[in-house]
UniProtKB/Swiss-Prot annotation:
HAMAP family: ThiI. Pathway: Cofactor biosynthesis; thiamine diphosphate biosynthesis. The gene is thiI. It comes from Ligilactobacillus salivarius (strain UCC118). Belongs to the ThiI family. InterPro entries: Rossmann-like_a/b/a_fold, ThiI_AANH, ThiI_fer, ThiI_N, THUMP_dom, THUMP_ThiI, tRNA_STrfase, tRNA_sulfurtransferase_ThiI. This is Probable tRNA sulfurtransferase.
Amino acid sequence: MQYTEIMVRYGELSTKGKNRKNFIDRLGFNVRESLHSFENLVIKAHRDRMHIQLHGEDYEAVMKRLKQVFGIQNFSPSIKVERDIEKVKVTAVEMVKEKFKEGMTFKINTRRSDHNYQYDTNEMNDILGSHILREVPGIKVKMKNPDMTLRCEVRADGIYLSHEKIDGAGGLPVGTAGKAMLMLSGGIDSPVAGYLAMKRGVDIEMVHFFSPPYTSEQALNKAKDLTAKLTPYVGKIRFIQVPFTEIQETVKEKVPSGYLMTIQRRFMLRLTEAIAQRRKGLAIFNGEALGQVASQTLESMAAINDVTTMPILRPVVSMDKNEIIKIAQDIDTFDLSIMPFEDCCTIFAPPAPKTKPRIDKARYYEERLDVDALVQRALDGIEITEIKIGDTFLNQEKKVFAELL
């Protein structure tokens, strides 16, 4: 069957009232970004539907990409037919015959946005249903839970036929809920947190701390590849790498080992907040899950959060590890996340970090450091990479070797 377009139905946008146009415009932008490699597509976003005209493009490849765009409730590969009822009847029979199996049941579901068309909804249902019963021997009508629902949408520019309704990603279009920074490590949790943030419409930029020579170029590229795994949901994501070596060496030299993790993460939060302010971010997301490690107790979170007034959002905070892993597998970040490259959170990890650090002690130990100067030098060294769909950074030979370790 040669489909001519994909009809997209919106998700939560129907609840957005006066802001609906802004949401639809943003969804249209995101769909164009996600599908930019399909050169022949024509995308038209209307108030109640989006129409993606295929013009010969592979509809299955387009739909695979569409499944990852937030803000879409569902979509259907469709055939546009002239408003000639005889041509509609012929096409309807062809669509049913292609999927027909002995004993199959069906119904017709007509939706009419053009009320000037010569046949109303019930008449269209009767005309098409009767014709299919005559032309497809063995098929039966069933109004509740049929094997196939043939959808017919009557519009001013034509009649659209479809028989599949494929679930989209749901959520809200990325960018409709503002911008935030995601503290991206190389682990399992933070990419999942980023995915969940984007699902609620947040435009995220990745902030990744690296500490050469203690962390390798491959570890940095792994974080970039994790970012690339999330680009199909939005089209492109900015990756901000922050040099962290001097801060870690200084903290290790001047702070008791039990507070190393706390002070390091306070610096990370200061830096992320400063980057967010520069880049008009409204919040910070991270992958902390309560109680997983020493830095993720409530006492640790309070001691670390002490350095900022910016909202810190933790989408996976109440999830079990298995729940997080399931999402990571679904979004295809898990296998990459468990590759054994070192990151700056582990290279100077103390043998017995404080699980209940005190805010007053954290402040006291920081008095030994020139905090402002350390932060400024790190900010001066940041690099920003725009990562697009299909980008890869990890050296494949080294990647294979790492998987064998």
